[in-house]
Amino acid sequence: MLTVLDFGDPLPQRPRRVLIAGVSGVGKTTLAKRVSRLLDIPHTEIDALFHGSDWTPRPEFMDDVQALVAGDVWVTEWQYQSARPLLASQADLMVWLDLPYAAVTLPRVLLRTLRRRVRREVLWNGNTEPPLRTFFTDREHVVRWSFSTRKKYRVQVPDLQKSCPELSVVRLRSPRQVERWLAGPLSSAVR
């Protein structure tokens, strides 16, 4: 049976294959990097595997995901419908960032998008955030995507009970819970 843990619950084992789940802009990659450092295991940013130049999907994406999950230890984000089943089937821990959307996630995704655009930050394979006006014209603009998909994890994560009943899931509902989980159960699992 799928085990859903609270931020203070001890982990059943030291995690070796970790997924970070949550809506766009919630802080998945930031948390994945922190988990990677704490556990001293590699983090692979799933967006870097997916996006080719000009924001096109890379044809090698699923081959790269298969190579990633074949490894003994890894941390990555639980994204992309085509990869989610494989990622979940090979993970031993999922950390679900279920943070308040209006108070936490929306400001984060807005500020991140604005910062990346203003600074012209190069993301994956030479891509940069598109002009801000595309918010109004592109249904898949990251801010619009974040808003339109903000509730899907409340269905998708519990549905894992059917396909991945042995997967442990830690559900974190606030930035404070994130910090307490990192300092508590995750740090304890490393000792």
Where are these regions (language model features)?
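Conserved nucleotide-sensing/catalytic segment adjacent to the nucleotide-binding pocket
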Residues: 42-99
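Active-site signature of alpha/beta-hydrolase-fold catalytic machinery across serine-
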Residues: 34
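Hydrophobic positions on the alpha1 helix immediately C-terminal to the Walker A/P-loop
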Residues: 31
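Hydrophobic anchor at the beta1->P-loop junction of P-loop NTPases
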Residues: 20
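The conserved Walker
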Residues: 24
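Conserved lysine of the Walker
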Residues: 28
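A glycine- and Lys/Arg-enriched "phosphate-lid" helix/loop adjacent to the NTP-binding pocket
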Residues: 101-152, 183
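NTP-dependent small-molecule kinase module
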Residues: 2-13, 144-191
